[in-house]
Amino acid sequence: MLEFFSRLSLVTKIIIAIILGIGVALLFPTVTPYLSLFGELFIKALKSVAPILVFVLVLSSIANFQVGHSANLRPVLLLYVVGMLLAAFSAVIASLSFPSTLYLNTVSHNNLQAPGSLADILKNLLLSFIANPVQAISEANFIGILAWAIGLGLAMRHSSDTTKQVMQDVSHAVSAIIHKVIAFAPVGIFGLVAVTFADAGLATLESYAQLLAVLLGTMLFVALVINPILVGLTIRGNPYPLVFKCLKESGITAFFTRSSAANIPVNLDLAERLGVNPSTASVSIPLGATVNMAGAAVTITVLTLATVHTLGIHVDLATMIILSVVATISACGASGVAGGSLLLIPVACSLFGISSEIAMQVVAVGMIISVLQDSTETALNSSTDVLFTAAVDIRSRQNS
C-alpha cells in the first residue's frame, strides 16, 4: 500500500489528502485536534526554510544572469516586465472587485495595521532595506532579505565562474531541501484540511472556490486580454492567431507538467516552427522560464490581498501599486522551486506588517488549491515565454 502511494504524483497525493481531510472532519470531528500537529509541522517547516530560500535563489539568479547574447533580447525582457506588472495590477483590481476571506488562526494578531500614508510605507521599506542581513534572515524580514540578495547578486556578477558555480550549487542544495518539505505537503495538508473543516464546516469550500475563481479568472484575463494587447502593439496586427497557437501548443503541455523548465524543449520546438531566430529563442525562452512569471505575480498579489482583507487591514492605492511592484520582483524568483510563487507570499505580506506565522498559513492555503492554481499558473507563464519571443521576432522581421 505504501509502495503504491509513493509512486503517485504529488498532485494525486494532495487530492487524496484533501478528500481524506474533509472525510475525517465530517465523520470524526473529535479526532481532528490530534491531527493538527501535521499541519503545524508543515507550516513550521515552510516558515523555517523560506528566508534562506528567498535569499539564495534571488542571489544566485542575479549573479548568474547573462546579458548581451542577442539584439532582440532587450525588447523581449521589456515585454516580460511589463506583462508581469500588468498581471499584478489586474490581480489587484480582481481582488478589490471580489474580495476573498481565508480561514486563518489570527489569535494574538488582531492588532495588525497597514501604514497610514505613502510616506510611512516608504519609511518602513527603507528601514527594512538597510536591515542587518543576518538579522533579516533570522527575523524573516523578507524586504531586507530581497534587498541584500539583489545587492550581493549584482556585485557578484563580476566574480569568477567558480564563485558563480558555488552559488548555483548552494541554490540547488536549498531547492533540494524545499523539495523534501514539499514532499511532506500531502500529510500537512491532510491535517490542515481536517482541522479547518472541523472548525469552519462546509463554508470553507465556498471560500476556496471564490479564491480559486479570482485566481484562475485573473490568469485567463491576462492570457486572453493583457497578453494579446501587448502582442498586438508589438506586431501591429491581429495577435489572437499567435496567442491561441501558443496557448494550445505550449500552455496545455505546461498545464500538465507544471514546470516551466520542463516545457523549455516544447517552447523551443514551437519557436522553430514559428520561424523565430534561433539566436533569440535559445536565450529568451530559457530566460523566460526563469524570470517571466506573470502567473506567479497574480498568485502572490491575490493571496496577499485576500490575507489583508481577512485581517481587516485598510490599504490605499499607493500601497497596492507598491505591492504590484514587489509581487513582480518576487515572481522573478519563483521559478527556483516547485510552488515557488506560494513560498514568496511572505515577501509581499511583509509590506502590511503581517507576521511570517500568518503568511505561512496563507502558503498552506495556497498548497490546498495548488492542484489547479499551479497548473494554470505554469501554463500562463510558459506559453507567454514563446508568445513574447515570437512577437518580438515578427516585429524585427517587419523592420528589416
UniProtKB/Swiss-Prot annotation:
It comes from the Bacteria. Keywords: Amino-acid transport, Cell inner membrane, Cell membrane, Membrane, Symport, Transmembrane, Transmembrane helix, Transport. It catalyses: L-serine(in) + Na(+)(in) = L-serine(out) + Na(+)(out); L-threonine(in) + Na(+)(in) = L-threonine(out) + Na(+)(out). GO terms for molecular function: amino acid transmembrane transporter activity; symporter activity. Gene3D superfamilies: Sodium:dicarboxylate symporter. Involved in the import of serine and threonine into the cell, with the concomitant import of sodium (symport system). Belongs to the dicarboxylate/amino acid:cation symporter (DAACS) (TC 2.A.23) family. This is Serine/threonine transporter SstT. It comes from Acinetobacter baumannii (strain ATCC 17978 / DSM 105126 / CIP 53.77 / LMG 1025 / NCDC KC755 / 5377). The gene is sstT.
